[in-house]
Amino acid sequence: MSNTSISGSAVALVTPFRQDTSIDTDALRRLVQFHLASGTDILIPCGTTGESPTLCQEEQAAIIRIVKEEAGNHILVAAGAGTNDTRKAVELALNARKAGAEAILSVAPYYNKPSQEGFYQHYRHIAEALDIPVIIYNVPGRTGSNIAAETILRLASDFQNIAAVKEASDNIGQIMELLADRPDHFSVLTGEDTLILPFMAMGGDGVISVAANQVPAEIKQLITLVQEGNLPEARRLNNRLRKLFRLNFIESNPVPVKYALSLMGMIEEVYRLPLLAMEEKHKKILKQELETLGLIS
């Protein structure tokens, strides 16, 4: 596959659990089939939305194998495989590759707050260890530090398999710098559903979306409308979805989206600690919006 396929609508896939918190493999297969039918371009299991901090390495490999088996060659599988220990991040990436991942999403090192050179060396080691595309995940709100645009662009220029960035900094200046100065092989994706419309209008390549768990066809359509220059229809669709985008973060992700999927009959509402079920007042608000959108009756 080419690096140019790191584009379009990518779903940050939830991990369904049974009541005993084991992985619900049947539900996982159903989710993949849902995305096959909905036009999703990329499946991203084992990321933040997939509760990756609570998954052991064997579980991550099993999830990736199932997702790849179910997706076949129809949808790219780009697995979450990152941590703040560079040696461990390389190990996770290699294991994801062995399990069937065709690309990996590697979160910026968190908590230990490396320098910009530390970020560069972290991703250099990952890129040199792999023969598949690497997507940098820059999410300062969770990691506590930002990978500067200059560092991301340096990595993209130095390593052909550093293929994309999931940019979730909410920094418009940084996004514009990445879009303006990136090499030809490098894709820039937003990690914010609320920014899909303006981001794509600025020349972005796609989104890694939480809401695509619930409304994958609509997320794909929103991207397509902007790419086709149909901004009036894109605005109408975005306005229809924007409350859902907001409510998906009324509590910590992925709690709201998993509750929504349980109401839609796709998974059980089960989380692993320290995540807990939503407060009843928030459940009521989200349920009303799902009814308004026609996702449940």
Swiss-Prot record:
Quaternary assembly: Homotetramer; dimer of dimers.
EC number from the UniProt entry: 4.3.3.7
Pfam families: DHDPS (PF00701)
Function per UniProt: Catalyzes the condensation of (S)-aspartate-beta-semialdehyde [(S)-ASA] and pyruvate to 4-hydroxy-tetrahydrodipicolinate (HTPA).
The keyword Kinase is assigned to this record: no
InterPro entries given in the database record: Aldolase_TIM, DapA, DapA-like, Schiff_base-form_aldolases_AS
An annotated Gene Ontology molecular function: 4-hydroxy-tetrahydrodipicolinate synthase activity
Location of this chain's protein in the cell: Cytoplasm
GO cellular component, one term: cytosol
Pathway connected to this protein: Amino-acid biosynthesis; L-lysine biosynthesis via DAP pathway; (S)-tetrahydrodipicolinate from L-aspartate: step 3/4
Encoding gene per record: dapA
Protein name: 4-hydroxy-tetrahydrodipicolinate synthase
EC top class, as a word: lyase
Catalytic residues (UniProt): 137, 166
